[in-house]
From Swiss-Prot:
Subunit structure, interactors included: Interacts (via N-terminus) with gN (via N-terminus). The gM-gN heterodimer forms the gCII complex.
Chain residue ranges for the region called Disordered: 347-378
Source organism of the structure: Equine herpesvirus 2 (strain 86/87) (EHV-2)
Coiled-coil segments: none
Family: Belongs to the herpesviridae glycoprotein M family.
Keyword Ribonucleoprotein attached: no
Function: Envelope glycoprotein important for virion assembly and egress. Plays a role in the correct incorporation of gH-gL into virion membrane. Directs the glycoprotein N (gN) to the host trans-Golgi network.
Protein name, UniProt field: Envelope glycoprotein M
Virion surface compartment spans: 38-84, 140-150, 232-239, 290-303
Amino acid sequence: MKSSKSDLFIYKTWFKLLVLYFVMFVLSATVPIAASFPGLGFPCYYNALVNYSAINLTERNVAKHLTPTLYLEEPEMFAYMTFTFLVDCFAAVYYFLGALAIMLAKRHFVVSLTTLSQWIAMVGTPTLILIGMWRMWTIQLFIQTLSYKHIYLSAFVYLIHFLLSFLHTQCYISRNSQLWSLKVLEQGIPPNTLLDTVVFTIKPLLANCQLFCLGLEMLVFSLSFMMAIGNSFYVLVSDIVFGAINLYLALVLFWVLLTELYLVKYMTFVMGFYLGGLIGCIFLLVPLWRYEQIFVAANLRSPILINILVIFFLCTLSALVRLLRMTWFSPTKPSYEPIQLKNIKHRRVKLQSPSGPSILEEGSSDEGSEDSEEEEEL
């Protein structure tokens, strides 16, 4: 069956957006690599924002220069950028396989005028691809602003990047659709095909990778936002450190509640975020161990450690709750038994219309042959 003109228009537009998506992916992979080498247009190494060995938790910020606060250092920032690149690379491979799967399925499995648009909705809508392109563009701007040491502009850019990542992950899992409509769309996926593998196997894996990356992005956003706040107001550096950790705790708690109350309806296995939260806690513990003397001298090592451990235990407990709900408390699927077919014989019954000739209507009888013979005699 041929697709409708609107379906073909969506199909062609989707492919053009994918081409732009792949171009943006190449650029987002090139910028961090180019920014790591001197002489390529970037004035400073973006991973080393400030000298954190000079951090003083008991002083207030000083105007006209950058006051060091808690932030990711070179190894942690490099690890975060590497994780982001790997997830974006996985997403690019996913969309490539999704496009290939739709091209192959288009030859034999188009059964309605809107089949192509339904498949595209299951793989990734044009809006979702556009949000993914904006994500990769903002991470490039973030690296460029960091290389110029513009902490305020970098915090603003990363705020946009974080909001786009939040929206992208939520839309990727739920697709902003009713659950029953997604069940209908899933029935339109041809079984035992590449499209079936992409939608039901590769897509959940990519969703968990994006959740893992979102857990790290919450940490980077908290540190960037509070560093900009700390260098804008006359406050103690220790207050900025506590503010960043507590903001990260609030974001993690919010996403845990959103997951258990809403997202699990669409995808039950969402363990990637909790793993990202645990890695984020390790990123916070590294400077606490690296500059232990500074934190001990300010009598802040124990309070900061307790706050970080609260996030660690929250992620661990949430992961255990999710596993328990998946295994023990998940509703069992109803069991169906095939209905035994009986001998059904159709009979024609005359119905007299009050304002016209008699109407013939088909009836059904599942009784034995004796009843049918009696009806024929009558």
